[in-house]
Amino acid sequence: MTTDSHYGAIGYNPFEGLELTGRVKKVFLRGQCPQDLDTAKNIGSHDPVEQTHKVMQNIRQLLEEVGGKMEHLCKVVVYLTDVRHREAVYRTMGEYIKGVHPVSTGVVVTALARPSWLVEVDGTAVIPDDAE
C-alpha cells in the first residue's frame, strides 16, 4: 500500500513523518492545561477559546525556556471534554502554530484532572542544536 493510495482512501495522510538529522534536542511536554505555570492557578474562564490561548501560551513559554520555538513542535495530542469545542480549539491553536503542521491526535474524554478544564494539550518538539 502506498502513501498516495492510503491518502485517497481516507482523505488525509496518516504517514506524515519526521526525519531527524544532526544533533537535536527532543522535548516532551506534559499535558498543558489552562493554568498559570508558576502558581498552578486556573485562569478562571470556562470558555474553550480562552483556555486554549492559555494552554498554547504555556507551551510556547516552556519551549522558549529550553531554546525552542513553536515551529519546533512536531506532535501534539489534544484532549477535549466536549467535541463541540473542537473547531474553536483547533482554530485558536492555529494562531500559535501558523505554518507549522505537527502530527496531531484529538481525543474526546469524559473529564480532565480538574472539572473546569475543557482542553489539555501535550506536545513533542525537536529542537535543532543550532536553533536561534
Q: Where are the predicted features?
A:
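N-terminal presequence-like segments and the immediate start of the first folded domain
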Residues: 1-74, 80-132
